[in-house]
Every structure is written in structure tokens, then in C-alpha cells.
Design a protein with these regions (language model features):
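GNAT-family acyltransferases
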Residues: 2-140, 149-174
């Protein structure tokens, strides 16, 4: 049983040379977004130490962020404390998903500092073109909504996603 199909048409024939994506149509992601206060980079092992520090210092804040409820509140088991090596394995997994066109994860940076992440996945509910979640570290909590709004606009304008489902953020995505 695979992930749900991603119902988006792309103008590109292949994404990263792959034609066997689990998405219904091949996605060729646009250039990562860059704004006056942050830039996106494809989440990769190069971010390991900075990513680890960002979310490990912000577990409670992330659990309070829309889309990241802990298991006792109906969410999944991330984030929970883990080792730097376990985080590296997770980043390698996200990178493989990106290259295969299965899901798209980005590190959010301000200069060289990792201040959050963005995850773009097929929408398992079928209610939207994509399911999107984002978080910022606790020390940047005031930017949480700003990040989500800018990402949503980028997904609409550059990715051409007509509808985006943001769990816990009903004002976004339509």
C-alpha cells in the first residue's frame, strides 16, 4: 500500500529523471522560495546539526503548532527526542522522497540558521491537491503564520496547486 496519488499536472515530463513516482502526475518543483526574511533549501543531510538543534530546542512549541499534535492529541510521534544519527537517517529519508517525487521537504533558513521546515505531501484525504505543514523554532514563533502564508502563496503561484490542505489552519489553502 503506497501513499495517495498527488493530483497535480506538471509541465515537465519527469521530475529528477523519475517516471515511477507515487504521485498521479510527475511534479517538477520550482526553484525554492527566497524572501526578505527566509529562504528554502531542499531538506538534506547537510542540514543535520542545525535542523536537529532547531527542532530539539522546540519540541513543545512544535507540538502546539497546527498540524503537529502529539499522539495523545491525535497526532503522530514527531517530534520526539532522538539522536543526531537518527535525525540524519530521517533527513536522508526526506531527501530520497524528494528525489523520487514522493514528497517534498524543505529546510527554512535565515542566513545559515535553520529556523523551521516545510513538508508538502500527497493529500490522503483527497480533499486537496496537497497536504502541507510547516513549523518554526520556538525562538521564531512570531513568524509561524507569516511563513505559512508565504508558503501557501508560493504553492499556489509557483507550484500551481489549486488547493492545499493545511491541517489545523483552515484559513489557508483555498
Amino acid at each position: 500500500m503506497g501513499r495517495p496519488a498527488f493530483p497535480v499536472k506538471s509541465t515537465a515530463a519527469t521530475a529528477f529523471g523519475k517516471t515511477d513516482s507515487v504521485f498521479e502526475h510527475v511534479i517538477d518543483p520550482p526553484e525554492p522560495l527566497s524572501t526578505t526574511w527566509f529562504r528554502l533549501e531542499i531538506l538534506a543531510p547537510v542540514h543535520n546539526e542545525r535542523d536537529y538543534e532547531a527542532w530539539m530546542s522546540s519540541i513543545e512549541h512544535i507540538h502546539a503548532t497546527a498540524g503537529f499534535a502529539p499522539p495523545d492529541r491525535g497526532g503522530d510521534d514527531w517530534p520526539t527526542p532522538r539522536t543526531l544519527d537518527q535525525n540524519l537517517a530521517d533527513l536522508e529519508h526526506h531527501r530520497r522522497e524528494f528525489v523520487a517525487g514522493e514528497a517534498f521537504a524543505y529546510s527554512v533558513l535565515d542566513g545559515d540558521d535553520v529556523i523551521g521546515c516545510v513538508y508538502i505531501d500527497p493529500d490522503g484525504s483527497g480533499a486537496a491537491d496537497a497536504m502541507v505543514r510547516s513549523w518554526v523554532r520556538a525562538s521564531r514563533a512570531e513568524r509561524d503564520r507569516d511563513l505559512a502564508v508565504e508558503i501557501d502563496q508560493w504553492l499556489r503561484d509557483a507550484w500551481l496547486l489549486r488547493s492545499r490542505r493545511w491541517p489545523g489552519r483552515p484559513a489557508l489553502g483555498s
